């Protein structure tokens, strides 16, 4: 397998995941102010709620990953982020926004640790500089997506700010499934020594 084929899916997955997180992190306060009429100070507190949910979720994900099947973590993560984005798109209240923000933050949280674990297992003998390239590309997704979202939001409604991560979460889910299928198909049969 060519090197690009080996790491294309994890690379795209991290690109999309960083784009999702940074879109919400960058646009959430403006979304709350324009969509719900929440004060700028309160919207910044709600942004802190998002980052707190993401941080606490990542710590909890590290604790439960050895004990819970990764597919269950993934399905729960995707369901939470989908539901959170849908709630944020549809809500008219501060309570709905807070619930959606918690679900989005908690839903995004386990994806990064799951992918990093997969990348480490897939490329155990690679130089650390290789991983630097992967994560630099991922950060590029986090930088480009909020920038592009500004142009999209200008031409459409501010609700697109939460629709974008909804679509991105679907892409992350599909890419994670592809990575797991590929790892199952390329694994040596049980009982045989490679």
Question: What positions do the PLM features span?
Answer:
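Paired small-residue
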Residues: 84, 95-103
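Symmetry-related core transmembrane helices of the 12-TM Major Facilitator Superfamily/SLC fold
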Residues: 162-179
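Intracellular juxtamembrane helix-capping segments at the cytosolic ends
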Residues: 109-123
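A late C-terminal transmembrane helix in Major Facilitator Superfamily
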Residues: 124-158, 165
């Amino acid at each position: 397998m060519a090197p690009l084929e080996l790491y294309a899916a994890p690379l795209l997955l991290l690109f999309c995941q960083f784009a999702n997180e940074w879109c919400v992190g960058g646009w959430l306060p403006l979304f709350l102010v324009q969509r719900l009429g929440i004060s700028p100070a309160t919207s910044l507190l709600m942004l802190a709620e998002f980052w707190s949910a993401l941080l606490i979720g990542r710590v909890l994900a590290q604790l439960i990953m050895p004990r819970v099947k990764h597919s269950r973590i993934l399905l729960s993560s995707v369901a939470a982020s989908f539901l959170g984005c849908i709630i944020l798109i549809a809500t008219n209240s501060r309570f709905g926004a807070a619930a959606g923000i918690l679900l989005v933050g908690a839903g995004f949280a386990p994806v990064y640790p799951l992918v990093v674990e997969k990348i480490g297992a897939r490329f155990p003998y690679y130089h650390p500089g290789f991983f630097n390239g992967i994560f630099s590309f991922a950060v590029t997704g986090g930088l480009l997506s909020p920038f592009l979202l500004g142009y999209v939001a200008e031409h459409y409604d501010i609700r697109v700010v939460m629709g974008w991560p909804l679509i991105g979460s679907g892409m992350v889910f599909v890419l994670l499934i592809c990575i797991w299928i590929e790892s199952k198909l390329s694994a040596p049969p049980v009982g045989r020594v490679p």
